[in-house]
Every structure is written in C-alpha cells, then in structure tokens.
Amino acid sequence: MGTGAASAIFAANRARGKVAFDVRLEDGVTRRGQLHESGSLRVRFPSPEADGLSAVFVNTAGGVAGGDRFDIDITAGEGARLTLTTAAAEKVYRAPGEAAQLSISLKAASGAHLGWLPQETILFDRARISRRIDIDLAENASLLLCEIVVFGRSAMGERMLGGEFVDRWRLRRGGRLVFAETVRLDGDIGEKLAKPAVANGGVAIGTALIVPGDEAVVERIREASESFGGEAGISAWNGFAMARFCAQDAARLRADMMTVLGRASGSALPRLWLN
C-alpha cells in the first residue's frame, strides 16, 4: 500500500466530535437550552441536583488518537448554575503523526456559575495533543475549574520518552484578559519532568482555578496543604485564586485536588469523582 493510500485511510479514521449547548435560569431552576451534538462526542444530563444542572461528557471513540478533533462550546445564561465533568479519565494514545486537537469554550453571563471538573487526562508514551481553553466570564460570574494531566501510564511504570503536550489557557473577566498561559512540553517529556525546576520527578500535574478568589480562599486551601502527597503552590491575584500541583503518584494528586475543590467551593463534587 502506498503512503498516499495509507494517509487517506488514517485521515478517514480520525475521530471528530462537537458538543455545544446553553443553560438558562427559568423560575429559579437551571434548565438546558439548545443542544448540538455531532461525531463521537456526546453529553448526558443526570438527574437534577440541588445545586444547578450537571452535564457529563462521553467520548464514544474510547480515547483520543492522533489527528482527532473535539470541540466543546458551553454558555451559562444569567443566574444559571452548571457543573461539567467526564464519564471517565480521558486517554490520549500514541500518535505517529499529527497531534490531536481539543478546543473548549466556556462562557458565563451575569450571576452565573460554571464548574469545569473533568477527570484526569492520561497521556500514553508518544501521545501528541494540543488543547485550548477559552473562558469568558461576566464581571460577577463565578468559576471553579480543574485539570489533571498524567504523563505516561504510571501504574504500569510507563514514562513519556517522546510526545507533545501543548496547553493554552485564556481567561477573560468583564471583557478584560486577566490570565493567559501556554504550556508546551515535547521530546523526552519524562526527562524534562524529572528536572527540579519543572516537576522534580512528578508524573502528574494539576491546576485549580477559582473565580472570584482572594486570600481567604487561599488560606482555606493552605490549611489542608500539609497533608498533600506532592508539591503544591497556592496564590491569588487579579480577583482569582489558583492552586498548582505536581506529584509522583497520580492517585494522590487526584485526592489532593478533591480536597482543594471542596474547600474552594463548599459544594459536593460530581458523583463520578467519588467512584
């Protein structure tokens, strides 16, 4: 088989998926508005909970491979409350060529609350993924966001000897850009993570973003940080708080993240996090 035919087959096998929907407050209850689903990305809405509406993303492709593309576009209307999570940890497989692309857009209107709480993203050795998260909040909207990335299947002793991870975050509040960050790791990622100035040997990293956030939020988290299983840093500026973690044990980092989310919000975590 020629390289052209092989490339055509590879392109045809790439997964595509998109979910876009909005929620709105009606008679004191958050309800789903318009919903669009396509490809291998789906969303399910469990039974309503006391604290707004919950949504669970399901990737029917079973993971993310090279060349895949997934797009998520979510809007919470005035006063609505929405928590988003995933049905399971997302696996990103070895990619011999093009990186997978993931684009996430989150918008919250006045008085709305968004919780973006996916379970872990696990990168297999030589996985390649480029992710972008764009968040646009009204001045008095609130956000609780977390992301955990595990480099290599640590339970199997796998290291990332190669691969690519690009992560772009942009946060706007009241129309102003208040936070922008791009993380890029490629080549022998395991070797880079071993450096003290990067992750000091950690194989998992996590970030929690709390808006609004101040020193009171930081102190609540710091009170619990002595029991954390890895390294952590917590700070607040520009009206939001952020906690960052790295650990050699992905399960321990997940437990630390659950502690932080509980102290930051006081609300119950999605039930899938408790399995």
Please annotate each region the language model reported.
Residues R81-T83, H113-G115, S142-L144, G206-T207, ...:
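Structural motif
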Residues L41-F45, Y93-E98, R126-R128, S154-E158, ...:
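A short, polar/proline- and glycine-enriched secondary-structure boundary/capping micro-motif
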Residues Q119-T121, C146-F151:
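Short, surface-exposed recognition loops or helix-turn segments adjacent to catalytic cores
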Residues G77, D136-A138, R172:
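Feature marks extracellular polysaccharide-active and adherence modules
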Residues R126-A127, R132-D134, L145-I148:
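Basic (Lys/Arg-enriched) interaction patch that binds polyanionic ligands
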